[in-house]
Amino acid sequence: SLVGSEMCIRDRRKTTDEYLAQVTPTRKNNYTGLLEGYNLITICAESFCPWFISEELTPTLYKLSHTGIIFDNYYGTFQSVTTNGEYTMCMGLYPDMSRTKTDSSFNVAGTNYLPFCLGNALREKGYQAWGYHDYIGDFYNRNITHANMGYTFKAADSGLDIKIDWPSSDLEMMEASVDDYLSSKEPFHAYYMTFSGHYQYNWDNAMSAKNRDAVKDLPYSEPVKAYIACNLELENALAYLMDRLKQAGVADKTCIVLTNDHYPYGLTEDEYNELAGQEMDLTFEKYRNSFICYVPGLSENIVVDEYCSTADILPTLLNLFGVDYDSRLLAGTDVLSNGVHIAVLSDKSFLTKAFRYDAGTETVIPADESIAISDEQLEAYRLYVDNKFQMSSNIVNSDYYAHVFGKASSGGTLEDTVVFTDITGIFNQASVLYMYRN
């Protein structure tokens, strides 16, 4: 019943209020505002992994991976389901894992108040924000969800003049989109959800077939060659992007961020090992991936060895771009801060510098024999991860940000909302959440 669901929303909000009042926020740090005023291009790359990158075959990806801020211990949280990985990258929250693809967290968030998504956050700072996807806009309802994140959104059948294929061309998407934001005097943020890397990995894949010649002499099996070939379309898109940024005179002030939506599940384990050139441990290392954060013009690279994963990208970027946000309201952690650094996988397994925890078998694997992990330590981390998932579900299912910031909400009623008088702007880092207890 409607009354029941309103009660449920109220309970969720109350529990979340109480939980957040106990959480220690991360502080501003030396990297706060480092990229203020830079343009930002973020890319959620379909089935991406770093193992095919080389200076010879993919010079642009190689350059992007080795220039700027280098995250040495980054793990993509998800095994499969694009919408979950994309959601986590965009929201800094975990999806409600009890939801299905068709009833995803993204769908629910399509009507929620989302102040921390990069599109909305950077628009507040005077940026224009564009979003693109090279498949149809109705797929996963991106035309609704991405507009709600602050993007002027275009997809292959809605505003983006490209051929729809299986998969479509990331290069064509790039060619059809860059003029939107390069023609403006304002700083810009553009977000891309790519498609060319989508399985199946054989020569019926339109992008694998297109780039087949470039991989024909590589020493791999056909599926691995086909995987690399379709990902060369992403490389070509990025090469084109870099050229256009240079021509427009904005290359030296544009940060480019790229990560995967999920592990390339279209490859068998043997094929993935073949591509990686090593036997990957299936619990943890197969999720090792890239959080490319290309920043031109630093005097030297910033190398970060903290363990981190998909949800950490948003808070890290908000901090770098000088957006004030209350760090307690996101599940991820700014990787450059002094917070708790942990790489989290979708089954709640996790990795830290000291140990790894396999949730499936409830096994602890210390980083080396000299380290003893106490039950209390393990329990503290397990609880930390559980809480982040629970908090994330509560936030999406109760339109929690609308409640905190006193906004009208489709998820509850205004009577449910507490208006905080000490908030001057939506990003005020006042301790807004030491809140009412009822």
Regions inferred by a protein language model and the residue ranges of each:
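Short, small-residue-biased leader/transition segments that mark boundaries at the very start
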Residues: 2-9
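Fold-level signal for large, globular catalytic cores of enzyme and receptor domains
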Residues: 13-17
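Solvent-exposed soluble domains appended to multi-pass membrane proteins
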Residues: 18-438
